[in-house]
Curated annotation (Swiss-Prot):
GO BP annotation list: organic acid phosphorylation
NCBIfam families assigned to the protein according to its UniProt record, in alphabetical order: glycerate kinase
Taxon lineage: Bacteria, Pseudomonadati, Pseudomonadota, Betaproteobacteria, Neisseriales
Family assignment from sequence similarity: Belongs to the glycerate kinase type-1 family.
Protein name, entry field: Glycerate kinase
Listed EC numbers: 2.7.1.31
Gene: glxK
The species this protein was found in: Neisseria meningitidis serogroup A / serotype 4A (strain DSM 15465 / Z2491)
Entry keyword Kinase: yes
Length: 371
């Protein structure tokens, strides 16, 4: 039996690669002749680039850039020939910012623009960027600063490139703007369709989880709106521009990037269609499968790309009651790995073992003679 194992990461617990390896161990315990092909995936959220680089055998490199609070910091990126990938969260991810410092209006993303300039100087032509899991809410002003834009208040004083400055912004200088070469293509791997502004936009949707007080939502949202009406009104209409606290919008406006489906692009890059062409079973998974998963998340994206006739089974941390009845979206069965009632911290810690147990049990089911 040949099985493709294509899970997303389990947030705050296991990477997609670790999830896939645990599931493989489970199947090896219960199916004697099993052949497991590991295809860790991501849909644009945090961990997507790590999932892709395992399949593409990319070389890890580092560059010193401006960090989240103006200090110098080393940032990872992954390269193969003229292709490069990186995640914004490697610089300004929630997990990298201590709780006491989580003010999304003070966190800087200038280093992302600096990294883009470096990659282009190294003759990179294809750049893929994951923007999920960020702690910033700067509307993309940091990206612009890293690409040479300068910002001033009404008295002509230079402003730092952070979200707070949007509240005092009076003018923008493009005198030192870095122009992206026409033969360079920058693509944003997105798993959300949130616009830049409004009640479905970056601030209202993600501000709270990043530490922004709800009393600031309206004024920050309006400041981002005013900024883009000055520099790039068209960006306000882009679906997905709100991803990464507006970083996606900044990349589109200032780096001529395009927003693409995170999961579909991931599957294209790892040549998923070829890998799944002759398999007996596909396993998908993520930490929590719910109705929101139906809108572009990894398990559904993988299931839709699986050939008709190949069964798809989901192995997840938890299954939420709002899911439609099975089968749905080409998924024939779904299993939660939870084995007992216990604190969340323990479930996260034991996830690898629970994944093994669940996969092993599914393997035993597959071994049963047809009834």
């Amino acid at each position: 039996m040949k099985i493709v194992i294509a899970p997303d990461s389990f947030k705050e617990s296991l990477t997609a690669q670790q999830v896939a390896e645990a599931i493989k161990r489970g199947f090896q315990q219960s199916i004697a002749d099993v052949e497991c092909l590991l295809c860790p995936v991501g849909d644009g959220g945090e961990g997507t680039v790590d999932a892709i680089r395992h399949s593409l055998d990319l070389e890890e490199k580092c560059l010193q850039v401006t960090g989240s609070f103006g200090q110098k910091e080393v940032m990872r990126y992954f390269q193969k020939e003229q292709l490069a990938l990186f995640e914004v969260a490697d610089l300004v991810g929630l997990g990298k910012i201590p709780l006491e410092k989580r003010n999304p209006l003070q966190i800087q993303t200038r280093g992302i623009g600096e990294l883009i300039r470096h990659l282009i100087s190294q003759e990179i032509k294809e750049i893929y960027i994951g923007v999920g899991g960020t702690a910033s809410n700067d509307g993309g002003i940091g990206i612009a600063a890293g690409l040479g834009y300068q910002f001033y208040d009404e008295d002509g004083n230079a402003l730092p490139a952070c979200g707070q400055s949007l509240l005092n912004l009076a003018s923008v200088s493009t005198e030192n703007r870095y122009k992206i070469p026409e033969d360079v293509h920058i693509r944003i791997l997105a798993d959300v369709v949130s616009p830049l502004c409004g009640h479905q936009g970056a601030t209202y949707t993600f501000g709270k989880q990043k530490g922004l007080d709800s009393t600031m939502f309206e004024v920050v949202d309006q400041a981002i709106q005013d900024f883009y009406e000055k520099v790039s009104p068209a960006t306000l209409k882009l679906k997905g521009a709100g991803a990464g606290g507006g970083i996606a919008g900044g990349l589109c406006a200032f780096a001529q990037a395009s927003i693409v489906s995170g999961i579909d692009t991931c599957l294209d890059l790892i040549d998923f269609d070829k890998k799944v062409s002759d398999v007996d079973l596909v396993i998908v998974g993520e930490g929590r499968l719910d109705r929101q998963s139906l809108a572009g998340k990894a398990p559904i994206g993988v299931a839709k790309r699986t050939p008709v006739g190949v069964p798809v089974v989901a192995i997840c941390g938890s299954l939420v009651e709002d899911l439609p009845s099975l089968p749905f979206e080409n998924i024939q069965a779904a299993f939660s790995i939870l084995e007992k009632s216990e604190p969340l911290e323990d479930s996260l810690k034991n996830a690898s073992l629970y994944l093994e147990h669940t996969a092993s049990n599914i393997g035993h089911l597959l071994n049963m003679p047809k009834i």
